[in-house]
């Protein structure tokens, strides 16, 4: 029999398959299946650690290549070279052969050695350049330091030990002006010159002063331009210093302190002629180093620029290759037959495509032994695979955030496509705000391709749900027209059905009443009559309307959700769920809240002014229905025979409680006892035979779908475990279900009043914002009024977008999401499934965080 056509209404039919693949083409088969993205592989080596698996060495080799590619990327970022990103819509990567992967690994190794060598050379030369630059600054500043030092011999003398003072005086007395340059050596005074970071100068000076007890004379000057620190590759401000002291031990101590503080000490001659020669030598060496450095940098940048053209493609290729070997590690290896054996789940309708793909790989490899795929009969619960497209994907995602639907149950996302945005629109309901939202959604859809590349997380989240925003905006336009509300103002699209009756003695401040223009004729054709806006009883009327509408929408939402539980029970052939849960639950719910909705609609349809009667309150009616059955509030009837009808409905609702409570558990116990009496095992017991048991395994060379099957079952919906029927557990579960259902019928209905509350809040906030900005601006006159109008409109627009569209929109969306997750899904969805996660390259590229920076 041909398989059923897959529909979005429920998950696709799944089959467990067993693949027998020749070891020579295992990698190629995995590549082909990764491109298809239709097989969810099971781990057949769960007892082995990651290091014991067959292809661990290949993965480690690819990890090393990936590390090398990341190293290239870091060097490109350091050099400021842009990366050419991989565009999946334009660029096509053909599956590489093992030879091409080996060549890529060798090339990456060679390039890493070359780039590392160039990088080391560059860093060494850069460090040498900095040292020569610092030395030049020291030589340049040293002349001034020495001149000042010779002019302050008294200060230098005071900075030395008192025991040496007579010697210094004697030397000074015998020195002439011509001998001044050799006076330091003659006075046994030495010096240390160098460069230190500006942020360390103060600490450096304090340490020297305390360590040497003031026996030093220090000069320093700032280097005006920042110098690049090669260790951190950032500009650093530094100072030149020259410290004068006497004694070899003190000078050695100064050098040690300087080096410990991160200072660089340089050799400087105190004679100006020799210093001049040093400057010339340093300049020549610096120029040579800069030339070599420039050439090295150009070579390195050229190498990295060439790598940047292919790096993204290489990274994706290696990532795919790693995924292939990780998947191969899930396979079992039959050493006797040199065959890889794999098990997995795939959509039943896609089995022919998978078979043809395996055949194509076999034909390309030229193997005589075919790859075989056998469908296995199993009692394991298949994964849930819900096919989506660009439009439904976001809706499916918000449902999956709550849970994964049970295999083959009604897909909760299908009704959500309509109900979620519509309930949002009921709460949002402003025509003007909806138009702005609609324009934003259409813009995101129109410029879809360029906006897809935006990496800003918050925008990416909104962009992912662009079709949700679109549908929410369309429904909000509709509800805005129904409410006749645009930025808290009304639209006079049609003639009003009301007219004001103005008394002859009318004065400002008096209340004016309105009457129907044609009592038995014209009615406002669509939405809310604009005459209601601005009246004294506007809120009274609108609140009553929106409150009752919220109850009706909640009733409709929960009723269709209950109907889905009937569809699920029929599909899974569980009639007891229909008669034990659905029927009594539906009768209970409709006896109370279905009746309330009918009363609301009936009350709306009666011309109470024409009858001359006061309409009864429905809230009190419902309270009296439970507290005083057969009694009406104030004795006012909504319709003839109301008291009798309410008593009958209440009895009908009460009768359903024991049916809900006892029918299903006792029926299951009776069914179990009957089965045991006939000699069968208890309901829920199952037997399982491993798919890889050699005794039960058929010859894999046989191409029949079921000849290789080795999985047997006694329960179509089992999970492969032995479960005895326990009446106590079933009874407790049913008691909980009954209590929850009865209480939730009340609480969930009340929960829909949030539709009215948020709609009211949105309308009132919009009115306040208008009155605080545009209303005042429109009243102003003259040039100042025009300027104020521009400013007020800017404020009005910005605050409308931020507060009323974004903040209020998010609030309404979350409330609508709660109504879907809790009030609707609790009526029919089990969410007992597990997701279908196939081996797919496309999915890997979309979800990998590491590859995002390589894909554009």
UniProtKB/Swiss-Prot annotation:
Cytoplasmic side: 1-409, 448-460, 565-582, 669-738, 824-856
S-S bridge residues: none
This protein's UniProt keywords: Hydrogen ion transport, Ion transport, Membrane, Transmembrane, Transmembrane helix, Transport, Vacuole
GO molecular function list: ATPase binding; proton-transporting ATPase activity, rotational mechanism
Topology in membrane: Multi-pass membrane protein
Superkingdom: Eukaryota
CC terms in the record's Gene Ontology section: fungal-type vacuole membrane; vacuolar proton-transporting V-type ATPase complex; vacuolar proton-transporting V-type ATPase, V0 domain
GO BP term, example: vacuolar acidification
Region entry Disordered, spans: 689-710
TM annotation in the entry: 410-428, 431-447, 461-490, 545-564, 583-603, 649-668, 739-763, 785-823
Summary of subunit composition and partner proteins: V-ATPase is a heteromultimeric enzyme composed of a peripheral catalytic V1 complex (components A to H) attached to an integral membrane V0 proton pore complex (components: a, c, c', c'', d, e, f and VOA1).
Family the entry assigns: Belongs to the V-ATPase 116 kDa subunit family.
Annotated protein name in UniProt: V-type proton ATPase subunit a
Source organism of the structure: Neurospora crassa (strain ATCC 24698 / 74-OR23-1A / CBS 708.71 / DSM 1257 / FGSC 987)
Gene field: vph-1
